Amino acid sequence: MSCPYAGNGNDHDDAAVPLSTEVGKIYGEYLMLDKLLDAQCMLSTEDKRPVHDEHLFIITHQAYELWFKQIIFEFDSIRDMLDAEVIDETKTLEIVKRLNRVVLILKLLVDQVPILETMTPLDFMDFRKYLAPASGFQSLQFRLIENKLGVLTEQRVRYNQKYSDVFGGDEQALSAIRSSEYEPSLLELVQRWLERTPGLEESGFNFWKKFQQSVDQFLAAQVEIAMEEPVEQAKNYRLMDIEKRREVYHSIFDPAVHEALVKRGDRRFSHRALQGAIMITFYRDEPRFSQPHQLLTLLMDIDSLITKWRYNHVIMVQRMIGSQQLGTGGSSGYQYLRSTLSDRYKVFLDLFNLSTFLIPREAIPPLDETIRKKLVHKSV
């Protein structure tokens, strides 16, 4: 069957009219397939002991790296668009579109793991000796993705050495790592964007003050309900639960407590950015906050899918080499990979925890006419 985009879609029409009379590259030349399809060098074959599944191993990891390259391409373009004082609705729509593309790519990468799992541990052992000292830990592009997303160096789990040391004397790789560490990450740019959320201004709608008042009223109403509980033990339990909730809310209303949690690594956003994220979450049904809410949701999807990919990778490694063997690059293998599943690698952790601070819909402060008019004319 011929490509429908190459002619008029008629498989039997040998006189297809070309789209252009200009001389161009044919399919294989344009995609440089001669280089791409000749890049699978099986070391077992060179050793005259060819192992069939080594070919699958190479192809799968090369496919990962190609998709990593596309993710970096999308992240860089998104960071460029976010790096502005004002982001109009058109740009927000484009950012949402490209983040969604990254989400779909990551879903594809997660689904690639079962293909590798068609290889048995014994099959893998047949060629594993050829891999050392190579290791997935040495994937430069995955490290760049982490840094561009916002994984902090101090949050990383160390294994024997700093993560960038595995690139040794590769100055080009080290330069790329350094640049990715010092350039504004997606986390930093999203934080700046959230800090500008309209409605946070103390001289205007002052959402944060209204939210605190709503929380106080909500908790006071809960106390009244608890006090009517006839069973003393149940009443005390309810009152204790309300006090715990009050402490949780206090952690976002007191800037000093919030800052302490940031320094401890339990929160990522600045206090102002967290306020913006909560406001967007509450008013996501408002037209002006619809796209920003989609953007925040997609950031959580990206974090979730990377975690899911890490988890699938961990399970596959345990299945292939067990829990005690070292990785081919000298890491602790399964133990190291399992440690990367913690929240310290979750960049947009604060977005996942927003549900902790929700209040009933009827308690959410209503938008007044002034802020509604402002939202009509102001980009977020």
Swiss-Prot record:
Heme binds at H313. Its EC number is 1.13.11.11. Keywords: Dioxygenase, Heme, Iron, Metal-binding, Oxidoreductase, Tryptophan catabolism. It comes from the Eukaryota. Pathway: Amino-acid degradation; L-tryptophan degradation via kynurenine pathway; L-kynurenine from L-tryptophan: step 1/2; Pigment biosynthesis; ommochrome biosynthesis. Its cofactor is heme. InterPro entries: Trp/Indoleamine_2_3_dOase-like (IPR037217), Trp_2_3_dOase (IPR004981). Substrate binds at F57, I58, I59, T60, H61, R128, T328. It catalyses: L-tryptophan + O2 = N-formyl-L-kynurenine. Transmembrane segments: none annotated. GO terms for molecular function: heme binding; metal ion binding; tryptophan 2,3-dioxygenase activity. Binds 1 heme group per subunit. The keyword Cell membrane does not apply. One of its GO terms (biological process) is L-tryptophan catabolic process to kynurenine. HAMAP family: T23O (MF_01972). Belongs to the tryptophan 2,3-dioxygenase family. Homotetramer. Dimer of dimers. Heme-dependent dioxygenase that catalyzes the oxidative cleavage of the L-tryptophan (L-Trp) pyrrole ring and converts L-tryptophan to N-formyl-L-kynurenine. Catalyzes the oxidative cleavage of the indole moiety. This is Tryptophan 2,3-dioxygenase. It comes from Drosophila persimilis (Fruit fly).
